[in-house]
UniProtKB/Swiss-Prot annotation:
Cofactor(s) needed by this chain: Mg(2+)
This protein's name: Selenide, water dikinase
Subunit relationships: Homodimer.
Recorded GO MF terms: ATP binding; magnesium ion binding; selenide, water dikinase activity
Cofactor stoichiometry and binding remark: Binds 1 Mg(2+) ion per monomer.
Feature type site, description Important for catalytic activity: K24
Active site: C21
NCBIfam families xref list: PRK00943.1 (NF002098), selD (TIGR00476)
Keyword Glycosyltransferase on entry: no
Catalytic reactions of this protein: hydrogenselenide + ATP + H2O = selenophosphate + AMP + phosphate + 2 H(+)
Pfam families: AIRS, AIRS_C
């Protein structure tokens, strides 16, 4: 059968209503919906949706728990291979964010009739490349026809029940590490609008296609204490950090000068190149975040920017910060110490 083609669609991002993890439901909407659901969590279920963590964890035996996550989204870039790679890396990130090891994955595909099938083949090949890099097989999947292409994975992992790293254990006296620069949401919006420089597109692509495996393995190594761990994705640094502080009943201070940013992103934000999801993120957290007086709104947007396969955010006891930093550096992870955890009403203070 001949492939169906179109001369009208030249770019994958033309078919997406928003890019990557910015396509998530607004945090406020999700909270409203989940708030009406009763948790059926039993004694074997170690992590559910009550703390908005990155994956579900279910104990199978005294020394083994299964970790399950699912993640998919519309195109963030026009190259189908790179789109597949980004989506797969993003799905795998949730496993690493739980201190777990991935075992296998299933593909999730939504694909329009009018695109050539070779596009889908390239998307799947991109996903396979990241599964290969993670050392896991893809054992199957599910596909449906959809006017908007989407791709992602359901990933299954494993961890010792006593070594699960959740987003709920941060303690006053901890310091906060971030393993990737912020700004991929704004960068992909610039790509979608055709206003991104080649340098920005290359840098953002490098961030989004880099697995969080190395950082995840360091945090799970047991070489130093990790009180809480999550990945920074669709709700931005502020949103995911606020989830961490809410669970810990503590308050975070962020040092603006230490937070790594993708070059060109602040200028783009100042020009209004900001995804709707990022603006929703800022609106959701604004009442619980204190910014320095006069801080431009464009910088606030960057801190709330919806990330696609963003870095890991870890809460580590201050006395072990140097040990953690050295271990991350040895693994080739360019981590930044961006703030600290203090006693206080759940929220975030941005300083600097």
């Amino acid at each position: 059968m001949a492939e169906k083609k179109t001369d009208k669609v030249k770019r994958l991002t033309e078919l997406s209503h928003c890019a990557g993890c910015a396509a998530k439901l607004r945090a406020s909407d999700l909270a409203q919906v989940l708030g009406g659901l009763k948790s059926t969590k039993g004694p074997q279920a170690l992590v559910g949706f009550s703390t908005n963590d990155d994956a579900a964890v279910y104990r199978l035996a005294p020394g083994m728990a299964v970790v399950e996550t699912v993640d998919f989204f519309p195109p963030v870039v026009d190259d189908p291979f790179q789109f597949g790679a980004i989506a797969a890396a993003n799905a795998l990130s949730d496993i690493y964010a739980m201190g777990a090891r991935p075992l296998f994955a299933l593909n999730l595909v939504c694909f329009p009739d009018e695109l050539p099938l070779k596009v889908l083949s390239k998307i799947l090949a991109g996903g396979q490349s990241k599964a290969d890099e993670a050392g896991i097989p893809i054992l199957g999947g599910h596909s449906i026809r959809d006017p908007e292409p989407k791709f992602g994975m359901a990933v299954t992992g494993v961890v010792h029940p006593k070594k699960v790293l959740t987003n709920a254990g941060a303690k006053p006296g901890d310091v906060l590490f971030l393993t990737k620069p912020l700004g991929s949401g704004i960068a992909t919006t610039a790509i979608k609008r055709g206003v991104a420089s080649k340098q920005l597109a290359k840098r953002a692509l490098g961030v989004m296609t880099t697995l969080n495996r190395a950082a995840g393995e360091v945090f799970a190594s047991g070489k130093f204490k990790v009180n809480a761990l999550t990945d920074v994705t669709g709700y931005g640094l502020l949103g995911h950090l606020l989830e961490m502080m809410t669970a810990a009943k503590a308050r975070a201070t962020l040092d603006l000068e230490r937070i790594p940013l993708i070059a060109e992103v602040p200028a783009l934000a100042e020009d209004g190149v900001v995804p709707g999801g990022t603006k929703s993120n800022l609106a959701h957290v604004h009442k619980k975040v204190r910014f320095p007086e006069g801080l431009p709104e464009c910088i606030q947007w960057v801190l709330a920017d919806a990330q696609t396969n963003g870095g890991l955010l870890a809460s580590v006891p201050a006395r072990q910060a140097l040990k953690a930093l050295k271990a991350l550096e040895a693994a080739g992870v360019d981590a930044a110490l961006i703030g600290e955890v203090q006693a206080g009403k759940p929220g975030i203070d941005v300083v600097g």
